[in-house]
Amino acid sequence: QKWNVEVFGQIPCREEEICVLHYIMVSKPWHYNDCRLQEYFWESAQKTSVYAEIRKVLESYTDEERKRDAESCDRLMQTAKDEIAKENNYLNLVKAGKLKSKDRLEVLEKIALYEKEGRFGEDVEEDPPTRELQPSEIDYLRKKLKSRIKTRLTYKVARTFLNKIIENKQLIIKDVIGTEHMDALTSGAVITCNHFNAFDSFAMQIAYEKSKQCKKRRLYRVIREGNYTNFPGFYGMLMRNCYTFPLSSNRDTMKKFLSSMDTVLQHGDFMLVYPEQSMWWNYRKPKPLKKGAYTFAAKNHVPVLPCFITMEDSDILGDDGFYVQEYTIHIAEPIYPDPQKTQAENVDAMRRKNAAVWKQIYEEFYGIPLVYDTAEAVQYVGKPTNIA
């Protein structure tokens, strides 16, 4: 609220925290001499070319006009009170679950349709358009000084943002279970996680920071090409500068991607991969897994660390009319490649073990069997067709 503080009634924050003041109704310095916080307005007004004109407006404003303002203010206050008293006011409808975001409802309908059709690897939301990422545009290993500086600064911004969404209950981590499995790792690893929200990467960051590994191993993240090349604004900055590994439709860029992946894992760092490929908003079931994560691990002789996030409704109602989810992050035992098997055999075996672990966590946490509402029976592990 500090970015839009209305000068009316009780101010919602300390004066020194205010970023933007909004003078409303009978609290306008250009109409009244006794306005609260007017000194900030006049300090700014003095710096403009219309300062003298604003002063004339104040001097010429009549008591009759002020009386009319006060009456208008009283009417607005009464209207607000009448609305609050209504049984079917906006807030009550939202709390009763009768008024939910049209956008979210459409996404849920699309998820139900895609599940029925077995289209688990397809995204249900409009992603940014994908532009081909060129090799010269990406410094995967942050070898350049410019890349390192950008990453360091962006990480600080991201940390502030993460703290804020936790404080505002937009991200709620109820528990992290199994950090000892991450602590026990003695090499690089591919961390897998289900993908259901733009914030689940932040949840995994918190799990990583709760382990002893955060002081000696870096956490990288595989992301889609369009998120790196075309994602706008603040989130685009995070996508490009927070140890991300964007995939690419360019063959030469993918060679660079794979070489850098080998370097990261052999150096002893962690790579977060979403093997389901698609993101389905608040979808609780594990989806069929693609082979990419397990190929990275098997090729570099490092383990896969399966993580699965379960969800429960909190008592916090989001702006979209749905309850904010409380996350429990489950970190399972690492899955190691078998030195007696070929790479292809290890990819298949590790993928199937990961699928079994996620299925077990899902069924034990929710107390129900993993069943899909599909027109035809779907193999949970899925067909290993795509790289990630």
Q: What is the meaning of each model-derived region?
A:
Residues 94-130:
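Soluble, non-transmembrane catalytic domains of enzymes that act on hydrophobic metabolites at membranes
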Residues 99, 107-116, 255-388:
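Non-catalytic C-terminal accessory region of glycerolipid acyltransferases
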Residues 1-97:
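A glycosyltransferase accessory/donor-loop signature
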Residues 183-251:
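Catalytic core of membrane glycerolipid acyltransferases/transacylases, capturing the structured
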Residues 122-175, 233-241:
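A transmembrane-helix-recognition feature enriched in membrane-embedded lipid enzymes
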Residues 170-177, 252-255, 310:
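Short gly/ser/thr-rich secondary-structure transition/capping motifs
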Residues 20, 188-190, 268-274:
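Residue-level preference for the first positions of well-ordered beta-strands
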Residues 162-195:
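Helix-to-loop junction immediately C-terminal to a conserved catalytic motif
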